[in-house]
Regions:
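The feature marks cytosolic C-terminal regulatory regions of anion transporters and related permeases
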Residues: 408-410, 422-423, 457-462
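Short linear loop/turn motifs
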Residues: 159, 403-412, 449-455
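Transmembrane helical cores of multi-pass secondary ion antiporters/exchangers
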Residues: 1-402, 406, 416, 429
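Short glycine-/aliphatic-rich beta-strand segments at the starts of folded cytosolic domains
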Residues: 418-426
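Short flexible/disordered coil segments
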Residues: 192-193, 220, 398, 407-411, ...
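Cytosolic Rossmann-like ligand/nucleotide-binding regulatory domains
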Residues: 430-482
Length: 482
């Protein structure tokens, strides 16, 4: 088929449509949507589209990762992560470092075996391990939501904090090791200084620029409210770029800036959250498709045996060992079952594949082998861990039903209103015990019925309104004082 502008748009539309339907199928069957997105990209790459530009894939990945990390930061609430802040930070820093070290040493040992078809020196082995040392919990929580599950012992916020904040550490390890290879060796002091500068500058820039974004959103008077989300999006990219120019970690800055915005009062919060959520999904799909198009399945199969051994080592030994060592100082605060579950949720996602493009673009010897191994292990992790998360949670007795949030009416109150909205469905038991009119409901002091939904009809509430089984009442009440 001749690739005209119209045909490119058509192919792009088909890719997005197929991906959306694949995501729906994945959600229904409790499988990671990422796995199907990658599969769609690989399928189109085999027959219809020729794409082999690692720099373009890296650029798409960087843009997508900025949006994903910022959105993840906005969803991270200080009140939820405060009890598990210490273990979460330890896992996202030392956990990544230990996983990279253990896996890198195993790859180096494996490279020395005569029967393997890869022979990587120590630093390159550590580089390979570093690219896939961070976790991706976004797919995990999509699975838990699809099966209406939650987690005990504050595991959910701890895993969210780890997954949102460990990408910067893996990125720094990857960049430093690439620089080490290209410069024929760097001193320990240089490596340590690079880490310190990236962390300090990244954290400071994220905090300050996050504060600036809040100030701009609340003080800048824009006539068209649709421009507020676009203003925030520009801040996301500005934060990443300016931090990188100052030799800081742009990904860390973006995540912290997202946390600042998400935990403070801002204008048009609902519109901004809706915009960012849709944009996050769009760029996740584009990123996964792009990475799926980039891989050559034939080259990936050539390293399948070695990649399988490395992947099994990471899942069974590398990740659990690093988790248990990192959580050792916290003693009985985190029980054994929780440690086992955290070890199992070492899910690899798109981020390792993005980081695997850095050695390719930098021209590191053996970069193609690194990319293919990382891609294979990502698929392996999604198939083995991604499809069994809910089963493992149930087996360990850590799953609980997910509490309902929001209401079925799609109504939200501004942050400044100190009230809660919730909906109640009328049952036969309610009618038998309280009565069949609205005035018989005997609602608590300070609670009012705003509207009644009966089928597709909305009714204005009054005391004499006869209630039917299945009616939904939208209630507004004062927030509980803590």
């Amino acid at each position: 088929m001749l690739l005209t502008t119209e045909n490119i748009i058509l192919i792009g539309a088909l890719l997005l449509l197929v991906s959306v339907f694949a995501g729906k199928v994945a959600y229904r069957f409790g499988a990671p949507a990422l796995l199907l997105f990658l599969g769609v990209g690989m399928l189109f790459g085999l027959r219809l589209i020729s794409f082999n530009s690692a720099p373009v894939a890296q650029f798409v990945g960087m843009v997508a990762l900025c949006i994903i990390l910022f959105s993840g930061g906005m969803d991270t609430k200080f009140t939820e992560i405060k009890p598990i802040l210490s273990p979460g930070i330890v896992l996202s820093t030392f956990g990544v470092l230990l996983t990279a070290l253990f896996t890198g040493l195993f790859i180096w040992w494996l490279s020395g075996m005569s029967w393997t078809n890869i022979h990587l020196p120590l630093i390159t082995s550590l580089l390979l391990a570093s690219t896939m040392s961070s976790t991706d919990s976004a797919s995990v929580f999509a699975i838990l939501r699809s099966q209406k599950m939650n987690l005990k012992h504050n595991l959910r916020p701890m895993l969210e904090l780890e997954s949102g904040s460990n990408d910067p550490m893996a990125y720094m390890l990857t960049i430093v090791l690439i620089q080490f290879i290209q410069s024929s060796g760097m001193g320990v002091s240089q490596i340590a200084l690079s880490f310190v500068i990236q962390f300090i500058v990244g954290a400071a820039a994220g905090y300050l620029l996050g504060k600036l974004a809040i100030l701009m959103l609340n003080k800048l008077n824009i006539d068209n409210q649709s421009l507020y989300p676009i203003l925030l999006l520009s801040f996301v990219f500005f934060t990443f770029s300016i931090t990188d120019l100052m030799k800081g970690n742009g990904y860390l800055a973006v995540y912290i800036a997202g946390m600042m915005v998400g935990n403070n009062k801002i204008m048009y919060r609902k519109e901004i959250y809706t915009f960012m959520d849709g944009l996050t999904w769009l760029f996740q799909i584009i990123m996964f498709l792009c990475l799926g198009l980039l891989v050559n399945p034939h080259e990936m199969l050539e390293v399948a045996c070695v990649a399988l051994l490395i992947g099994v080592f990471m899942i069974v030994i590398g990740r659990p060992l690093s988790v248990f060592l990192c959580l050792l100082p916290f003693g009985k605060r985190i029980n054994m079952k929780s440690k086992f579950f955290v070890s199992w949720v070492g899910l690899r996602g798109a981020v390792p594949i993005i980081f695997a493009t850095y050695p390719v673009v930098a021209g590191v010897p053996g970069a193609d082998v690194i990319f293919n191994i990382v891609f294979f292990i990502t698929i392996l992790s999604l198939v083995i861990q991604g499809t069994t998360v809910s089963k493992v949670a149930c087996m360990l007795g850590l799953s609980t039903p997910m509490e309902k949030t929001g209401n079925d009416f799609g109504v939200e109150l501004p942050e400044d209103i100190d009230s809660d909205l919730r909906d109640v469905t009328v049952t036969q038991e309610i009618l038998d015990t309280k009565g069949d009119t609205l005035k018989d409901m005997n609602l608590p002091q300070g609670t009012l019925v705003m509207i009644v939904k009966r089928g597709n009809e909305y009714l204005i509430p009054n005391g004499s309104l006869k209630l039917h089984v299945g009616d939904k009442l939208l209630l507004i009440s004062e927030k509980t004082k803590e």
